[in-house]
Amino acid sequence: MTSKESKPSRTTWRGMEPPLRETWNQVLQELVKRQQQEEEEQQGLVSGKKKSWVSIDLLGTEGKDIKKVNIWEPCEKWFAQVVWGVLWVLQIVLWGCLMWEMRKGNQCQAEEVIALVSDPGGFQRVQHVETVPVTCVTKNFTQWGCQPEGAYPDPELEYRNISREILEEVYKQDWPWNTYHWPLWQMENMRQWMKENEKEYKERTNKTKEDIDDLVAGRIRGRFCVPYPYALLRCEEWCWYPESINQETGHAEKIKINCTKAKAVSCTEKMPLAAVQRVYWEKEDEESMKFLNIKACNISLRCQDEEKSPGGCVQGYPIPKGAEIIPEAMKYLRGKKSRYGGIKDKNGELKLPLSVRVWVRMANLSGWVNGTPPYWNARINGSTGINGTRWYGVGTLHHLGYNISSNPERGICDFTGELWIGGDKFPYYYKPSWNCSQNWTGHPVWQVFRYLDMTEHMTSRCIQRPERHNITVGNGTITGNCSVTNWDGCNCTRSGNHLYNSTSGGLLVIICRQNSTITGIMGTNTNWTTMWNIYQNCSKCNNSSLDRTGKGTLGTVNDLKCSLPHRNESNKWTCAARTGRKGSQRDSLYIAGRDFWGRVKAKYSCESNLGGLDSMMHQQMLLQRYQVIRVRAYTYGVVEMPQSYMEAQGKNRRSRRNLQRKKRGIGLVIVLAIMAIIAAAGAGLGVANAVQQSYTRTAVQSLANATAAQQEVLEASYAMVQHIAKGIRILEARVARVEALVDRMMVYHELDCWHYQHYCVTSTRSEVANYVNWTRFKDNCTWQQWEEEIEQHEGNLSLLLREAALQVHIAQRDARRIPDAWKAIQEAFNWSSWFSWLKYVPWIIMGIVGLICFRILMCVISMCLQAYKQVKQIRYTQVTVVIEAPVELEEKQKRNGDGTNGCASLEHERRTSHRSFIQIWRATWWAWKTSPWRHNWRTMPYITLLPILVIWQWMEENGWNGENQHKKKKERVDCQDREQMPTLENDYVEL
């Protein structure tokens, strides 16, 4: 008990901190990183990319060589950069204000910024089950120190289904073995109880009939329950599969269990709470025991083919290699030798972890005859094995202190006068109320068996191991591709134990029976050359070989002293078995699948026994169906979005940006300016929301602390009530004893015994008090001790109440401090000068509207300029028709005096006549009618520009006052007749 100055202790377990935590620096770095990524993605929308200008070609072709010039581009770039910089400054200021507000001393720290989230799995796996508190629930709670039934939910009525996906995510298809301490505590209590009353029990006889047989026989049944926040996962469907196949020997290093369906419960199924060693169990346990007959998973395994493996795959629960049945902390419960049959280490004890995988299942006794396994009569006389399996305990079995027959119908029941609790033996005499000689046919029985070669995934058939001198070279008897992992690719034509050189370079011993059936393959990486060098170094084996001789079924080597080499007890190579002094007796040496070169004395590849388990191992096996979890259905933790979600969001943003229209810089500047004004209005609410959330988080945390303190008060009160109840039970027992004494005194007084010097009072029986002495707490404490514990409970409860009241006061204070949004804004900033700009809002809006109108006007003017430039490029070709004036005949003869036709080099001055306004209008109107603009309704307003274009053309040709004249040009005149000249209405023709 701690002192009153220290913090009061809790009755529940600690270690309930949030599973995930992040520092504020990590959060800030993450935010900055995401902001930089968004900026890189958005780069180029405002600057850095050239926007294409719209051009209009009246002739239907684009002027590829004409360079477009935007006179507003420098202004747009400069203004956009200025606005962008202002927005960046505003953003930095807002972030700085937010960080300053969150770093205030009276607010929660960055580590305390938490969120109430739902755990995706709903629970957390507990690997160290010895740290989990547990209690028992039974009807006989007054005798056993357990809780009454109803204190915990019934697992058959209240449970939660767990999906297969969550099971695979948490357990990775590996339902592990757990050495639970709960059964060990029960065994420790029984052992302590027997030791404290050992002297009294030695004086008893087998005629004494007591209620203690319910305890010994395991009739008191109950459940194991775990308190919140712990729970139990009860598997409903499971199967086993091999893992880590050894490529040298072919055995499975691990057999894993895959649970595909489970339920979360608070308590286990009902089971015997305590019992001594026994053979058969009650029929109430049959379903639970049968559930441990785990079948192989539906995968490609050789043992699933009954033609290759008669009987199919093995069924049962595989206790893994390396499991520790009794941990080091309770080594005093181990005893000298293991009492559990095949559940033992390599020395037959429980001190070391298991060296071989052990299977436990409910036995199938349908094929047994007179208490013996099938084909038992066909065994060799005196042998304890048949069909490759060595059986322990066939004939006589130990059951609840009695020797009974393995034949359930014989009814043999001999009392031994001893009880085995774990590895300790206690003399005890009792006459049980149950029928010892009953026919126990149909009762469930545990069967413990071991595959020493651990090749259960290949075959469930047990074989008798070959002796080393029966291993010979299989010349021509083995075909196919043989290996320790592929038995099906191998064929044999003769029974025997064939030494074969594998394709991988090692050696194989192929066991062939019935001239064609391969029952086993043992292998090693040692090649033939290395083995033969060892063989040649053996004494007197230079001229020997491993060839098969003899007419036996299996064959043998020629010289028994030159068999397959092995390492002797001195770890030296030898080829001969050890013999006696006279040389008449010779050791039987066998070859094992996992020890190819060792000195193996075990004849059979399997070991099995019936029964032999006490309540501790019975509970331990039934509890393997359960896994302890820590419920985290609603807990505090930091939410971290997965990377796939962030990538999906980034893709969505990019797709949305690609779908947006490409706008020019000035439009984006206007939009950003509007957004900046809106952001300035919303930034205040955002900061106020952050402040309000900060206060709210503090209040929620205070409420959580107050609730936790109240929970501690409830737990301490419950512990105190339990202690008071214990004192009341002691008081009841003592008062009952006093009443019995008073009653007897009154009876003796009526019988006139009062005149004696003392009353005729006999000693009362105290068996009832002895029944409860084995529990973990002592019920026979003195009143002074009980009062002292009550005072300690009261002091602890007072401290907890004060702490709870303080936490509640803090929670109420924090709850009252939560302000509304506007008060939070006033607290965060000084808004007296911030709202002065509101009077300029109308002017700002008018300015924005004016900018928009100006922008529209500039767009219209720009389009008009583009249209004018295109129309201005229309060219007309002037065709001058020169009509020769008539000349005198006498002059004609004079001009033709050179002997030519008079038209070879004649030049006239070009006579040019100016176009009238009507001619220009006709040409322009004809160009408009033939242009593609006339067919598009969006360009119809451009028709209003035609008069301006006509005036401009006329002024360009004639000048402002018509003073401009064309320069005279001399042109060649074709000498043609006037009748052949074209007749035109005017002098201008459009080309």
From Swiss-Prot:
In chain numbering, the residues marked as site (Cleavage) are R664, G665
Annotated region (Immunosuppression) at 731-747
- Alphabetically ordered keywords of this record: Cleavage on pair of basic residues, Coiled coil, Disulfide bond, Glycoprotein, Host cell membrane, Host membrane, Host-virus interaction, Lipoprotein, Membrane, Palmitate, Signal, Transmembrane, Transmembrane helix, Viral attachment to host cell, Viral envelope protein, Virion, Virus entry into host cell
Q: Which residues lie on this side of the membrane: Extracellular?
A: 107-840
Residues that span the membrane, as ranges: 841-861
Lipid-carrying residues in chain (S-palmitoyl cysteine): C864
Q: Glycans attached where?
A: 140, 161, 206, 258, 298, 364, 381, 387, 403, 435, 439, 470, 475, 481, 491, 501, 515, 527, 537, 542-543, 568, 705, 773, 780, 796, 830
Post-translation: what modifications? Answer: Specific enzymatic cleavages in vivo yield mature proteins. Envelope glycoproteins are synthesized as an inactive precursor that is N-glycosylated and processed likely by host cell furin or by a furin-like protease in the Golgi to yield the mature SU and TM proteins. The cleavage site between SU and TM requires the minimal sequence [KR]-X-[KR]-R. The transmembrane protein is palmitoylated.
Q: Name one GO cellular component term.
A: viral envelope
Matches recorded under SUPFAM superfamilies:
Virus ectodomain
Give a yes or no for keyword Cytoplasm in this entry: no
Q: Which residues lie on this side of the membrane: Cytoplasmic?
A: 862-991
Q: Which residues form a coiled coil?
A: 697-747, 788-823
Q: Tell me which positions the record assigns to the signal sequence.
A: 1-106
- Region Fusion peptide, as annotated, extends over 665-685
> GO:BP terms for this protein?
symbiont entry into host cell; virion attachment to host cell
Q: What does this protein do?
A: The surface protein (SU) attaches the virus to the host cell by binding to its receptor. This interaction triggers the refolding of the transmembrane protein (TM) and is thought to activate its fusogenic potential by unmasking its fusion peptide. Fusion occurs at the host cell plasma membrane. The transmembrane protein (TM) acts as a class I viral fusion protein. Under the current model, the protein has at least 3 conformational states: pre-fusion native state, pre-hairpin intermediate state, and post-fusion hairpin state. During viral and target cell membrane fusion, the coiled coil regions (heptad repeats) assume a trimer-of-hairpins structure, positioning the fusion peptide in close proximity to the C-terminal region of the ectodomain. The formation of this structure appears to drive apposition and subsequent fusion of viral and target cell membranes.
Question: Oligomeric state and partners?
Answer: The mature envelope protein (Env) consists of a trimer of SU-TM heterodimers attached by noncovalent interactions or by a labile interchain disulfide bond.
Q: What is this protein called?
A: Envelope glycoprotein gp160
Q: What is the lineage of its organism?
A: Viruses, Riboviria, Pararnavirae, Artverviricota, Revtraviricetes
Gene symbol of the encoding locus:
env
